[in-house]
Amino acid sequence: MAEWIPVFLMPNLRVAHDITVDEMAIVPSTDERLQAYETKHPQFRQFLQKFTDPFGARVSPGVLLLRSDAPETFKSIEAVSSFRDLLALSVIPFQRAKGTVHDGSHHIQYSDYFDFYPWVYHEGHKHLVCNTPAQVSLHEIRVFRGQTSPILSALEFDHIDVDSPLLNALLQRWRIRYGTKRPQWSDRALFRSLNMAAAASKMPAGVDLTTFSLGRNIGLWVSAFEILTHTG
């Protein structure tokens, strides 16, 4: 029987409204689709409950889910990351526009909110594993203490934060792109561009912000548009 499998946690994203297609979803940690998995893997629930902000306030991470019966083409890290990227770019330009019009910063304006947490639950080991370019590690859930990013304010993500027509169009293209092993160049280019745009949408720096930091992000935006205009 097919089930929903948690792939990554997103502790910077306080999800109040799920984003779902047949193969994948981003949901709040209280979503009923997690119940069957948590019954089989109670250690995962423990992991989910061990997140706070830097001052100890409890945080409920967003969860990216994958359907166990999804075609293999949807199970690659590229497909998962592209799903995250399309959501981020359906939110950030829209929220930056709202922030400009209404003269406020209380909006999700940076893609750091959509970052995947590097430690994940491993069903075989019943432990946490981390596999990044910098480290490959395994550790106990018992001693884990997860935190949100200290450079981000606590903001809730809801359906009103999304440019819905853009999101629906990108979800349709995502299913076309990853529904085949031989995608069209235009579909490959779109999601390469979105990935570059997601990088360009990160905070340019923390407390060490300079004009160099801003210039770096501008360069990434230029690359995102160049990818789209390339003919292949």
What do the predicted segments below correspond to?
Residues M1-G219, S223, I227:
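Charged, non-catalytic interaction/linker regions at domain boundaries
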Residues T229-G232:
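Short non-catalytic regulatory patches outside canonical folded cores
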